[in-house]
Structures are given as structure tokens and as C-alpha cells.
């Protein structure tokens, strides 16, 4: 089997940057790496990206609203394709898979939108559990500063409140799932990368 690492965190935490740096680190060590993300680039993923842009309200597609439950099911459908067509085959062939977000994002965000946590967990039971989940923890105030230049289509105060709930949920999930390790995302990019590499060496490579 291969190695499966997930990078999680609220918006602006630096997930994509750290996922790319970790992929390069593994490649330098001679591993074959698959760098992926959720939502994916499949039809499901593209549909979800349209939903995500609407923020904390119910998703809107072509003017029609869908419920948070329907949104959660779309995320799960996209994830099922992701797991069965990319993640499982890559791991079975001995590759390293690094994912920018995974089902923990669904738990944190959709729980913050009022859905039942246990229902969300049950909905994602098919998902392969990673060897390590790096939670890049960042205060919401800093998150908002970092993403201020991005295109935001919802009211600022609603985004702040949602991100606060999501951050709280991530920290609660870290107490529930032993594979989650917290890294301070306020540090420099280099220091964060060093912390992540340390976790990979300690939690995964030391046992190989």
C-alpha cells in the first residue's frame, strides 16, 4: 500500500501551498506522488464549486436553491468518484497521495451549517482513512486578511461567522480522529513545511 496524506484547514490557511511543497519533498525522496484536491475536477466537483461560491447560505444553481442535505450528498458523490477512481488505485499501486481537503472538510463545514455530525460521518464511511491529516490551524481574523483579495460573493460578516464555526469544528474533529495533527498556520511557509515533514517522518515513515 502507498501513503495517504490530507491537508485540511479553513480558507486562507495555506493548504494548496503546503500540499505542493509536500509533494515535491516526497518526489525528491523517490516516491511517485499524486497531488489531488476536493472538490475534484469531475462534473460533480465543478457543480460543487458553483455551490461553494454562494457561501453559508443554501447553494444556488441557475437560480434554484438546494438544501444543505443535497449539497452534502453532492460532496459525498464527488468523493466516492475520487476514492474509487483515483485514491484507492493509486494507494494499491504504492504511490503517495496528497489531497488538498477530504471528507473532514465536509464534516467541518456542513456541521457548521447545521447538519447532524453523525449523519455526515455515516455518509462518508466509504472513504479511505488517511495515514495522516495535517490541520493547518489559523485564527479567523488572519484568514479573512489573507483572502480579502479574493472574489467573495457573500456578505463579509456571514463569512466570518461561518469560518469561526468551521474552525471550532475542525478542532473538535481533531479530538475525535486520531489521524489529525494540528500545525500552527500562522508560522512562515518554510516553518509550516518543516513541521509537516516532521509529522510525516514521525507518524508514517518511521513505521515503514
Swiss-Prot record:
Q: Which reaction does it catalyse?
A: dTMP + ATP = dTDP + ADP
EC number of this enzyme: 2.7.4.9
Q: Name one GO cellular component term.
A: cytoplasm
Source species, domain of life: Archaea
- PROSITE patterns in the record, alphabetically? THYMIDYLATE_KINASE
Biological process annotations from GO: dTDP biosynthetic process; dTTP biosynthetic process; dUDP biosynthetic process
Q: What is this protein called?
A: Probable thymidylate kinase
Q: Which organism is it from?
A: Thermococcus gammatolerans (strain DSM 15229 / JCM 11827 / EJ3)
Q: What is the lineage of its organism?
A: Archaea, Methanobacteriati, Methanobacteriota, Thermococci, Thermococcales
Query: What gene does the UniProt entry assign to this protein?
Result: tmk
Amino acid at each position: 500500500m502507498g501513503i495517504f496524506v490530507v491537508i485540511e484547514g479553513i480558507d486562507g490557511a495555506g493548504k494548496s501551498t503546503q500540499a505542493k511543497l509536500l509533494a515535491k519533498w516526497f518526489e525528491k525522496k523517490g516516491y511517485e506522488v499524486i497531488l489531488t484536491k476536493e472538490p475534484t475536477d469531475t462534473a460533480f466537483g465543478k457543480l460543487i464549486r458553483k455551490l461553494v461560491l454562494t457561501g453559508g447560505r443554501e447553494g444556488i444553481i441557475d437560480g434554484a436553491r438546494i438544501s444543505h442535505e443535497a449539497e452534502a450528498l453532492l460532496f459525498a458523490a464527488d468523493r466516492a468518484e475520487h476514492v474509487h477512481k483515483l485514491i484507492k488505485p493509486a494507494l494499491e499501486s504504492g504511490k503517495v497521495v496528497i489531497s488538498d481537503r477530504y471528507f473532514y472538510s465536509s464534516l467541518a463545514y456542513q456541521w457548521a451549517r447545521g447538519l447532524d455530525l453523525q449523519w455526515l460521518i455515516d455518509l462518508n464511511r466509504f472513504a479511505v482513512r488517511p495515514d495522516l491529516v495535517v490541520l493547518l490551524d489559523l485564527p479567523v481574523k488572519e484568514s479573512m486578511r489573507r483572502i480579502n483579495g479574493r472574489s467573495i460573493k457573500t456578505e463579509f460578516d456571514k463569512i466570518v461567522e461561518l469560518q469561526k464555526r468551521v474552525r471550532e469544528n475542525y478542532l473538535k474533529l481533531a479530538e475525535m480522529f486520531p489521524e489529525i495533527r494540528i500545525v500552527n498556520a500562522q508560522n512562515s511557509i518554510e516553518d509550516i513545511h518543516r513541521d509537516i515533514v516532521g509529522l510525516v517522518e514521525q507518524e508514517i515513515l518511521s513505521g515503514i
